[in-house]
From Swiss-Prot:
It catalyses: reduced [plastocyanin] + hnu + oxidized [2Fe-2S]-[ferredoxin] = oxidized [plastocyanin] + reduced [2Fe-2S]-[ferredoxin]. Its main location: plastid. Its EC number is 1.97.1.12. PROSITE patterns: PHOTOSYSTEM_I_PSAAB. Disulfide bonds: none annotated. The gene is psaB. It comes from Eucalyptus globulus subsp. globulus (Tasmanian blue gum). This is Photosystem I P700 chlorophyll a apoprotein A2. HAMAP family: PSI_PsaB. Chlorophyll a B3 binds at M662, Y670.
Length: 734
């Protein structure tokens, strides 16, 4: 008999029903569960797949560069970044009628095009690219890297080139190489690019390979570096009248601590950015030489962890046993990596708008909104994934003997206290926040807005004041003209910071009031509830009072049969599944808040947010309804406009989202009956009955249906909001 899918599981391959296909897809990447898997093959497969991942990333970024060079208007945009709409790529669609062709022919293009809201134009411009030829060169280089990555992936699957398990478990060497090589050397290389190419480019000098060695980035060359006069590199920075991309008003400094923003581009000073990357490079190059490998010097991570027993005895045996636990569990390592990456991605979202690094991106409002929303959603999925793999670690890899009375074991020992405290925090936040919103809503409905409960966020305002915001009148730290920090700041460090924080044209430390106070606590409710569900799922993954033997059933199980009540819906997978809904809900509130506050800021009517955000109808009417009006009227009997595609996507997103409920609010027996009926009809219908299938059609399992429902819910939710966000922002600001 020919080998059937899935080849990695002979048991599943012999399943006579359609479960074979769905379950095969579901477990394709769960290498640990495959037939004949060994620890060595597991590590080697994952390692080789990393190269495939890199190849895809390089191919994708190469495609971005290639399509902009081929179909975009980069060179025209460079001449006038504030008024030319950047084109992502052309749209080829024979179904378009003439009104559509006209509506989508924008940005000086000859035919219908998509506008770029990803910020790539601003990024490429800032780092020194100026012509289509530059873009093509970059695309080819990335294509080359993609091919190299594919070859490397293939190579590391060949017997001679397969690394051993001991190589994968050499944590010190890996840390040294990743810290100094990946972060240190790459940051140093990036500093080099900024200093040699980007900064001269911002001053009107075009540096490429042909003149790279002739153009000195600084008039003094390397002299100050070797003579210790490093301060010379910071002298004579670009002036406030500097026109980006020209020599007008430019200076000669390459590494500065100016603070604040370039007045024309509203982005961080390039010389500050170069300085930052140099500092990062230095720190990581040092950090990459900390751990003991071949030479018998440096730290041994195992020794550090074994020695660390916190005083007072409250944490038991501290970190004993953790080194081997982490080093032998891929899920633990992945959980740590995802948790870190998730936080970093969310920080990227926050900092890309508040401290924009790319020239003119702050004035491209739709791009700002798109990038913030994009990074927050990505962060949400990555963070929930961290807890999922944490739970899998507890089920598959955790060894109680190895971790006796250490910090990990003690987390499990007092999980009731952790879970109940989180539950209390969630309940407190939820009832109080909703209570305030509902009270205010009723007061507005009864025509007595003055009876609202409006709480000033005085602690947050005090923190903003401590950083230099003067409008609240707190007179503390950097907002106090008498403080030594304030006086030092004028000359020594970041003199531009205080100007920037008190200028109302950027997003640094926005003025906050009662509306912000309320939505902040709504978001806190979402974060705490999401965390509660995820933490409970992980801490109860091995077992609970209700089901002490839970770990024997694996990560995702529907129930322990009909005869054991209370065992349904309590697998660690179910907790992850429920948490994703809360995660999406929370990020919905986060992005609504960010977007509405910024729309009013950009339009110059901040009072609309301040007045309407304190009650529920304000959010529904003055944010959601007002901003979706153009989408609801995307095309009508009079033709269409450039927002029509978003109007269609808005509808389509709702459709996908609603489809999710068909899988979520439904039971398996209903589908099985329906399938039996359809199969019966199929077999008795002429022509149709010529087509036979080998697998008996069966309904999706409970867990699979939930996954399909969750996927539709998530995708529809994000599509709907993406269309709303882009259309409502670009409709107002072009």
């Amino acid at each position: 008999m020919a080998l059937r899918f899935p080849r990695f599981s002979q048991g599943l391959a012999q399943d006579p029903t359609t479960r074979r296909i769905w379950f095969g897809i579901a477990t394709a990447h769960d290498f640990e569960s495959h037939d004949d898997i060994t620890e060595e093959r597991l590590y080697q497969n994952i390692f080789a797949s990393h190269f495939g991942q890199l190849a895809i990333i390089f191919l994708w970024t190469s495609g971005n560069l290639f399509h902009v060079a081929w179909q975009g208007n980069f060179e025209a945009w460079v001449q006038d970044p504030l008024h030319v709409r950047p084109i992502a790529h052309a749209i080829w669609d024979p179904h378009f009628g003439q009104p559509a062709v006209e509506a989508f022919t924008r940005g000086g293009a000859l035919g219908p095009v998509n506008i770029a809201y990803s910020g790539v134009y601003q990024w490429w411009y800032t780092i020194g690219l100026r012509t289509n030829e530059d873009l093509y060169t970059g695309a080819l280089f990335l294509l080359f890297l993609s091919a190299i990555s594919l070859i490397a992936g293939w190579l590391h699957l060949q017997p001679k080139w397969k690394p051993s398990v001991s190589w994968f478990k050499n944590a010190e060497s890996r840390l040294n190489h990743h810290l100094s090589g990946l972060f240190g050397v790459s940051s140093l290389a990036w500093t080099g690019h900024l200093v040699h190419v980007a900064i001269p480019g911002s001053r009107g000098e075009y540096v490429r390979w042909n003149n790279f060695l002739d153009v000195l980035p600084h008039p003094e060359g390397l002299g100050p570096l070797f003579t210790g006069q490093w301060n010379l590199y910071a002298q004579n920075p670009d002036s406030n009248s500097h026109l980006f991309g020209t020599s007008q008003g430019s200076g000669t400094a390459i590494l500065t601590l100016l603070g604040g923003f370039h007045p024309q581009t509203q982005s961080l000073w390039l010389t500050d950015i170069a300085h930052h990357h140099l500092a990062i490079a230095f720190i990581f190059l040092v950090a990459g030489h900390m751990y003991r490998t071949n030479f018998g010097i440096g730290h041994s991570i195992k020794d550090l962890l074994e020695a660390h027993t916190p005083p007072g005895g409250r944490l038991g045996r501290g970190h004993k046993g953790l080194y081997d636990t982490i080093n032998n569990s891929i899920h633990f390592q992945l959980g740590l990596a995802l948790a870190s990456l998730g936080v970093i991605t969310s920080l990227v979202a926050q900092h890309m708008y508040s401290l924009p690094a790319y020239a003119f991106i702050a004035q491209d409002f739709t791009t700002q909104a798109a990038l913030y929303t994009h990074h927050q959603y990505i962060a949400g999925f990555i963070m929930t994934g961290a807890f999922a793999h944490g739970a899998i670690f507890f089920i598959r890899d955790y060894n109680p003997e190895q971790n006796e009375d250490n910090v990990l074991a003690r987390m499990l020992d007092h999980k009731e206290a952790i879970i109940s405290h989180l539950s209390w925090a969630s309940l407190f936040l939820g009832f109080h926040t909703l209570g305030l919103y509902v009270h205010n809503d009723v007061m507005l409905a009864f025509g007595t807005p003055e009876k609202q409960i409006l709480i000033e966020p005085i602690f947050a305002q005090w923190i903003q004041s401590a950083h230099g915001k003067t409008s609240y009148g707190f007179d503390v730290l950097l907002s106090s003209t008498n403080s030594p920090a304030f006086n030092a700041g004028q000359s020594i460090w970041l003199p531009g910071w205080l100007n920037a924080i008190n200028e109302n044209s950027n997003s640094l430390f926005l003025t906050i009031g009662p509306g912000d106070f309320l939505v902040h606590h709504a978001i806190a409710l979402g974060l705490h509830t999401t965390t509660l569900i995820l933490v409970k799922g992980a801490l109860d993954a091995r077992g609970s009072k209700l089901m002490p033997d839970k770990k024997d059933f694996g990560y995702s199980f529907p129930c322990d049969g009909p005869g054991r009540g209370g065992t349904c819906d309590i697998s660690a997978w179910d907790a992850f599944y429920l948490a994703v809904f809360w995660m999406l809900n929370t990020i919905g509130w986060v992005t609504f808040y960010w977007h509405w506050k910024h729309i009013t800021l950009w339009q110059g009517n901040v009072s609309q947010f301040n007045e309407s955000s304190t009650y529920l109808m304000g959010w529904l009417r003055d944010y959601l309804w007002v901003n979706s009006s153009q989408l609801i009227n995307g095309y009508n009997p009079f033709g269409m406009n450039s927002l029509s595609v978003w109007a269609w996507m808005f509808l389509f997103g709702h459709l996908v989202w609603a489809t999710g409920f068909m899988f979520l609010i439904s039971w398996r027996g209903y589908w099985q009956e329906l399938i039996e009926t359809l199969a019966w009809a199929h077999e008795r219908t002429p022509l149709a009955n010529l087509i036979r299938w080998r697998d008996k059609p069966v309904a999706l399992s409970i867990v699979q249906a939930r996954l399909v429902g969750l996927a539709h819910f998530s995708v529809g939710y994000i599509f709907t909001y993406a269309a709303f966000l882009i259309a409502s922002t670009s409709g107002k600001f072009g």
